[in-house]
Every structure is written in C-alpha cells, then in structure tokens.
Amino acid sequence: MATIMIGSMAISVPNTHVSRASNSVMPVQAVQMAKQVPSARGVLYTLKREGSTQVIKHEEALRKFQEAFDQDVGIQRRLLVNKHSSIQSTKEGWFDLASLNFRAGSSKEAAIARRKQEEEDFLNGKYEQQFYAGVSATKSMKFEGGSVGFRTKYWRPTPKKTKERRATSQCRKPTYVLEEVLSIASKSGKLVEFITGKGKRVKVCYVRKHGAILPKFSLPHEEGKYIHQELQYASTYEFLPYICMFAKYKSINADDITYGDSGLLFDERSSLTTNHTKLPYFVVRGRRNGKLVNALEVVENMEDIQHYSQNPEAQFFRGWKKVFDKMPPHVENHECTIDFTNEQCGELAAAISQSIFPVKKLSCKQCRQHIKHLSWEEYKQFLLAHMGCHGAEWETFQEIDGMRYVKRVIETSTAENASLQTSLEIVRLTQNYKSTHMLQIQDINKALMKGPSVTQSELEQASKQLLAMTQWWKNHMALTDEDALKVFRNKRSSKALLNPSLLCDNQLDKNGNFVWGERGRHSKRFFANYFEEVVPSEGYSKYVIRTNPNGQRELAIGSLIVPLDFERARMALQGKSVTREPITMSCISRQDGNFVYPCCCVTHDDGKAFYSELKSPTKRHLVIGTSGDPKYIDLPATDADRMYIAKEGFCYLNIFLAMLVNVNEDEAKDFTKMVRDVIVPRLGKWPTMLDVATAAYMLTVFHPETRNAELPRILVDHACQTMHVIDSFGSLTVGYHVLKAGTVNQLIQFASNDLQSEMKFYRVGGEVQQRMKCETALITSIFKPKRMIQILENDPYILLMGLVSPSILIHMYRMKHFEKGVELWISKEHSVAKIFIILGQLTKRVAANDVLLEQLEMISETSERFMSILEDCPQAPHSYKTAKDLLTMYIEGKASNNQLVENGFVDMNDKLYMAYEKNLLRSLEAGMARIKLVGKIFYNMAIEKICSTYGEMFDKESCRRKQRIFRKLCECVLHECPVTPKKCKKYTFPKM
C-alpha cells in the first residue's frame, strides 16, 4: 500500500491489477485507507531525536563558550602571564605565584615557539648536509670579475604578443541543448514543453512508474477533451528518440497498465510496443475490448475506450493538494501531526466550501456561472438562505475547532441594517435642509444605512462628521447652578452589587471559590510584565511606602505579620490619617447640569465626606467591591506560593484583572493580549482616569460581558490629585475620599467629553505637576552645562518644554545646547537629533522677530512638525508624554483660535502671554544670578586679560578701535545671540 501525503490527510491508493477492461469506476474501500497506528519504534525514534537535539544544543553551547573564552583578550593575557610565572614559597610556609609582566611572558612564549619550530625542522630533515671541522667559511675579498651589460638608457623590453585564441563552441551538435534539457528533466522531474507548430504544444515529464523512469505525455482526455487522435505522430516523431534516450525501462507487461498510466511512452525495447502497435513508439491511452490503445493512432469509436487517466478522486485531491500547499498560514509555531481521519478532514473542507461557495457540483459550469452573475446583495441573500436551510448541519459544525469563526464571518459580512424605517425617518426630517449640522447628520445616516457594505472612505467621512457634531455640541453646553454642593448627597449603597460570574455554580469549586480556568493561564501576561513578586523571606518593609512624585501612601502589607500579643494586635488596626479634605467642586461630576453620582465621591447622610478607613491586607487575593463588604477572590493558582504587587505606575492593572473575572474562558487569550499589546503601551505609566476609562470602554466593545464587572476599591487623594486603586495589601493611610463607581460600566462614564469633572484628569497613582517640574528642570539647567548634558543623554524631550517661551529658546541657542544634542543623538536616534535641528532653526526665526505674539505664532505653526517627528521617537523617557501633551495643546489651541478668528472673535490672551513671559524671564535672571562664583571670576579674568593684551598692542590714539574689538570679543565670551548682538556693558573701559 502506498501513502500519498496531501496537506494534513493521508489517502491510501492501492496498486490495482487490471486484467480486463471495465466501464465501472472502482470505489475506494475503507480497508484501503491509511490508518495511523502508534508504534514503539516511532516513540523510540522520537526520544532518540530529542536526545540528539539536546546533545547538539549542549555541544553548540560549549563551542560558543570556548569561542568567547578564546576571544577575550584580558583572559588570554592573564593565562599567558600565569603560564610563565614561577612558584615561590613565602616566609609563612605558603606558596605564591611570582607574576611576570606581559612583555617577559610574551618573550618566553616566543622563545618556546622558536625552539619547538627548530626541533620540528630538525626532525623533518630541514637542515644542511655539511660538515664543519674547525674551519669557518669566509667570503673571499679578491675581485674575480663579473658580468657587464651593454644596455643603454634608451633600452626598453620588447612587449610580448598575445596570441588570439578563438572560443570553441560548446554546442558540438544541433541536438546538444535538447539532450541537456531532457537529461536535467529526467533527473528533476521538471515539465518540458515542445512547440511543434502554431498553437500546437506537447508537454512531457519523467515519472517513476512500475519501478522504472518513464516519459509521460499530457493527453487531452486527462483534461476532459476527447478526440480521435490525441498525438500527431508526424509532428512528434523527431523528438521521440531523444525523449526515450533518457528513460530507464524495465520489463512491463500489458496487464500492469492501469489507471493513472495515460501518456506513458514506450519504444521498441518494450513488448508493449511490439505487441500493440505497428508504429515504433507506443503512448498509453487506455483499453478497448481488453487491448491497449495507442494515443498516436486514430480511433473511430471513442466511446468504447476506457481511458487510463487518474480516477476522479485522485484528480480532485491532486488539485486540492496543489493549491493547499501554496497557501499555508504565515505563522508556524508548531510541528504538524495527524490528529484527524481523512473522513473528518473531508467534512471540514466540504463545510467551508459549501458555506462560502454553495454549489451542487464543483465541476458544473452552470453552478459557477449562477454565482458569478449574482450581484453583491443577491450573493449575501443567497448565503443567508443557504445557511438557514442547513441550520441543523451548522449546529454540528460548530463543534469543530474554528468553525464558529467561519460562521461569524459569514453572518457579519451578510448582516444588513434592520432599522431602515428609522433611517428613512431621519432622511425625511433632514431633507431640504442645507445647514452644516443637517448635512453632517445626512452623511452619518448614509453610512449607517449601508451597514457592512459601507466603504472605508464613507466610514471615515461619517466619523469626521460625527466628531464635528460632537465638538459643536460640546461648545454649546451650559453650566448649571453654583450652589450644588449645598444639596449634594451621594450616600454609600447599603446593598452589595451582585456579580453573576461569582454566583454561577459552574464557575465555583466545591469550596465556593471562583475557578479561573483558562483565564488563570492567560493572566500570566499581566503578572509577568506589570507585577513584581513579593518575597516574604526578604521582609515587607520595602513595600510599605508606596511613593509617587506628589506624595506617598503607606500600605498595610506589614500587618501580614500578626503579633500574638492582643495589645500589639489592636495597634495594627489603627491607621495613619492624611489631611481630611471637605466636599468641594472637585469631588463632583456633572453632565447636562445633573450630577453623575457614580463619578462622585461618597458622602454621609448629612452631606459630609465619607473618609476611607484602614484596609486590612490579605496574601493572595483580588479584592473587589466598593459598596458593602469586599469580595475576596483567590488569585490564579498558577503559582500557589507567590504574592504579587503592581509595579510603580501600573496599579490600574488591578482594574483589568477584575474585568478578567467576567471574560468568557474562550476569549481570555484575546482579552489579555489586547491589554498587553494595545492598551498598556498606550496608557503607559501614571495615566489619567480619562484614559483608563477610555481603555475600559474599548475593552467592553470587544468583550461586552465585562461591563458589569466589579471594580477594586478606588480612593481619591485630592491633595495630590491622584486616585489609588487598592489591591489585596490594603492601605495603612486613611482619610481619603472614596469613589462611588462600583462597576466598569459606571467607570466608563469618566471617558465622556461632556462630563464636567476634575477627577477625570487625576492620575491613577501618578503625578499631575510633571509639566511644571520639567520646565523648572530645564530653566535651572540652562546655565549649568553638566546638568544639561545629563538631561540631553537621559531625557532629551525636556528641551521641548522650551517652546513655552521664546526667551528660553534663545538662551538655549546661545549656550549651544541644541548643537550638543545633535552631537549626542545623531549616532543613536536620527529622529531625536532632527528635533534639535528644528529647534535651532525655529530659534533663529524667533530671534529675528521682536513681537511676542508673532513669536508664539511661529512656535504654534511648528508644533505639528514636532508632533510628527515625536511619533517616531523612543517613548522610554519620562518626559515623552509631557512633551506630547504640550504639543497637543499648541495644535488644538491653534485650531480653535483659527476657528474663532474665522467666526469674527478675537483672542484676548495676549496680556496673559506677556505676564507669563515676564515670570519666565525672572526665573532665567535668577538662574543667571546663581552662576557659580568660579564662573564669574573666570569671565572677569578673561576680560582683564583681553583688555591688558590689547592695551599693549595699541597706542592711546586708537582707543576707539580698541573698544570696538574688545566689545566683539566680549560678545563671544558672554555667548551673545549671533542674530541680535548687543553691546557689552559689563565693563567700563579705562581712559587712555
């Protein structure tokens, strides 16, 4: 039995023996199919191969170690010195190594190598066979004559003539190329095509059949064309001897010829030719009345011939395998094995084919033409009707791995907008209106009416129109009353929220604990990247203080060590309070003039703030629930003895971990990969609550079941403008406000632009004064070159904060910080170096203008260029997000100001810009005043030296020229601006 591998299926093709012709097609029996039987030999071979792989890996590691050891110059020098150092004994009786220097060791090594080479030469016979008996050979000093040449100074050697050699033709005879091509084809099995005339082509290849290498012609009946004479002997007889020249024939009887042998060529060396045709060559076509038929001969009745082309099943699988192997997945992460039978593979292929291309027969041209002539809408209706007619089969197919995605793709692509009546009503209401807002509504409605058939350009246009409408509506929002705090009440709910995922018996074990299942396995993507392990043996003291740039909070993790003394245990229940803030406008959130209570701080019945209490720690739990008693969920049991704490700036990951509880198990992989690869890189460290809520909304779009997921406890620190997401280690610091939002659906409301709230701009565990600190660091470092070099090396985006003031840009240009930045980053990152180049060009333009508003306008116009470059720069430095926010503010401000100017309004912030510029100038002057005394002395000494030197060179009458030259030198020393030079007034010239 022979096995043909087609994709991932094995089909058994029996070597049938046909003694006579038959009109019936031989069916493939079940016993003839390939069966996969595990064998002990295969297991041993697998183990042997795995062992060989490990041995090869070990030898490769040793080889790389030896190469690294030999290439280490320091180690080789130390080995050479120690090799030639002598061992000496000390007074205490110890033995020590008397180390030589490297030069002495090298000379000894060279002497040993030279002596060894001399010994080898002596043993190999490389010496002169001479005898010396006390007599030294001396050169005679007597002149014995020599050769004399007669060449003059004009002599030149005669150039040699090169003989021209004619290239011999490699083609010794006309058929040389043909023989070479056929020789290659017989070895490789490539297809050779002979063009015998206009529109007449003959295809030949060499195949292995019946233990021999035989030429095989491609005959018309193999492609479904039946003619009386398939090959013209008159047009092919010239090539037939050369084709048979490279064939290897064996003794083949007529009874051995069967299906699949059509096109085989035999010459007079075979009995098939001598017994079945009068021609010198025989090409198998089939049988007629038990006798083989030659394809080179004319046949009258073609219906009597039983053609020996491959059976339909083999032809089908040959075409299927050819296309299947051409279209493999681009991702290869495993080694394929045979896990399903041929019948199961055929069912899967047929199900996918009939789902996308439903026909009665794939070989029927009318079935294909029927689908070809359908319009796109008719084709979608055809697929939906076909799927509806075979609903029972689809219920069975969904159990096959991956088939539910096929069904989902078909349903999504064929879905239509069922609310056409609503869309038509919108058309009726907006018809004949030409205002901007009505036209925007019409564009959005057109895209919604088309449903899945909408094009990408139409979707983009609808999104832009929706954004424009949203911005217009936001600008027309009106504020509500001012005395809202007097009547504001936001009591804590007395009832705990019910989470269906924690109440379902199918998701609980026998102890009533939540079973993570596949969710726990995929949660490693969180713990491996954004959590760090807490090692109890090292103590909990280093985890107690949870710092952020604006303050700090103490965790209650130290309470995990429980004292046995009652008095000390009661002391562990006391927290450390921060300054308790009352309810202010920053504690509330409003939309359309109404309170959004889930986005507000919790209060008591009398309207006073509800302050947080001591949160006791637990070891390995996820604590959720903001109202009522908290719920403790065991962390995934992948590492039973490990405790984890979120890394600095990533405490918001506890929110996504709580959402994972409600994610379906089969979608847990997609959820965790989206959080790791898409959400967290965008949020980064210390994101705002606005960004966290937006990220939660994006996740709920793909996983709607997470909307009712319960949140961990969130404390609000108004003093630091920070929100703390409490994990299982609790909080020893008390006195914070408590956020009322208890579910993800309530937290998403922070993502609304219409929501009027200060808390949505709070950092989740982060810092809000980052921009001010970056500006301060830049201003204080302008006149300190060493600090500026550290900034350029570690955090170069801080220099973009100089865009807030033209004066800062000019001073940085004078100190040549931009040039230094280009030198540092031109070999590391071209995008960062490009930022410094553009900053230098912008400063030259700004310095040439004296009007502050025009200078700020130039900076705003360049912001978009900076933003496009910043997108390609590394995002690791801490000031990346701050610089990006500053550029975004300039870009958005420029766009809004342009819109105001177009509508006839005037920007009235010029006074504010001038006041802000004066404050920055005072800061710069203070920085200049704090220059070290050493620098001042250096400048004074330089000025005095220049004055005294030039005073000796000029007489008293050239005092004016001396002063002019001195001012020029003084400008260079004091780094005056090259565009707008100023006269040096720091020095009083002595009278000559």
Curated annotation (Swiss-Prot):
Motif, Involved in virions binding and aphid transmission: chain positions: 617-619
Residues spanning the membrane: none
Motif position, Involved in interaction with stylet and aphid transmission: 361-364
Superkingdom, natural source: Viruses
Active site positions, chain numbering: H221 (for p1 proteinase activity), E230 (for p1 proteinase activity), S262 (for p1 proteinase activity), C651 (for helper component proteinase activity), H724 (for helper component proteinase activity)
Maturation and modification: Potyviral RNA is expressed as two polyproteins which undergo post-translational proteolytic processing. Genome polyprotein is processed by NIa-pro, P1 and HC-pro proteinases resulting in the production of at least ten individual proteins. P3N-PIPO is cleaved by P1 and HC-pro proteinases resulting in the production of three individual proteins. The P1 proteinase and the HC-pro cleave only their respective C-termini autocatalytically.
Family annotation (Pfam families): Peptidase_C6, Peptidase_S30, Potyvirid-P3
Keywords: Host cell junction, Host-virus interaction, Hydrolase, Inhibition of host innate immune response by virus, Protease, Serine protease, Suppressor of RNA silencing, Transport, Viral immunoevasion, Viral movement protein
Native organism taxonomy: Viruses, Riboviria, Orthornavirae, Pisuviricota, Stelpaviricetes
Domain topic, free-text comment: The N-terminus of helper component proteinase is involved in interaction with stylets. The central part is involved in interaction with virions and the C-terminus is involved in cell-to cell movement of the virus.
Protein name, as recorded: P3N-PIPO polyprotein
EC id: 3.4.21.-, 3.4.22.45
